[in-house]
Amino acid sequence: MTTAIVGVGNIGSTVARHLTAGGESVVLAAKDLSRAQALAEELGPLARAASVEEAISEADAVLFAVWLDTMRELIREQADLLTGKVVIDPSNPIGFDASGQLMRTLPDGESSGSIVAALLPAEAHYVKAFGTLGADALAVSANRDPLAVLFYATDDDDADKTINRLIRAAGFEPWKAGGVDAAGRIEAPAGDLHQYGFNGEVVDLARARTATAGSRA
């Protein structure tokens, strides 16, 4: 199995490091190909760099580690190549105002997950994942004892199987929050199952079970 990671900023590079450390193959793509090449060289034989089109074509799963607006553009441009792929969406509807303060970029009640899922071709397999921790926490929380949880949301069986494999390979415990209608719960800035909703805490399986009791699909 190969996972394409489009975007090698804080989240993309961290996920790539965790996955290759867990034995998964990745192909990296970025607007600046030289950045993807440099990261691939750092990560070793399980990683290579390619154009966005080549990365998606070669992969079984595609993680778009980019801002929501950029993801929208990429999905429209690459829709044909995404048919049959597991598409992993770590986006959060956040940005910064003129004073540099974090702000929500979508209306209350609308999740970035619902937007992304609706843009994909019907034959794609969508899952919301790898965006429930801040980049710093994601980088340092792999392979804890007990394992830290990464929540995910999907309605798709193929995506469910794939994301369980990848989250475990990355050194975390997967825990399903629900279907796409639960995506907002695992998104910043206000999702109760995002790290922000736990007051910055990185939770384990026991805490995740308690937090989703009665609501988990």
Please name every model-derived segment.
Residues 1-45:
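NAD(P)+-binding Rossmann beta1-loop-alpha1 motif at the extreme N-terminus of oxidoreductases
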Residues 44-86, 92-100:
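Rossmann-like NAD(P)-binding element
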Residues 65-66, 90, 129, 153:
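Short, well-ordered coil/turn residues at beta-beta hairpins
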Residues 78-84, 119-121, 144:
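Short, conserved loop/helix-junction motifs that constitute active-site signature segments
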Residues 101-109, 114, 140-158:
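Short beta-strand and adjoining strand-loop segment in the mid-core
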Residues 106-130:
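Rossmann-fold dehydrogenase core element
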Residues 148-217:
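Active-site-lining helix/loop region of Rossmann-like oxidoreductase modules
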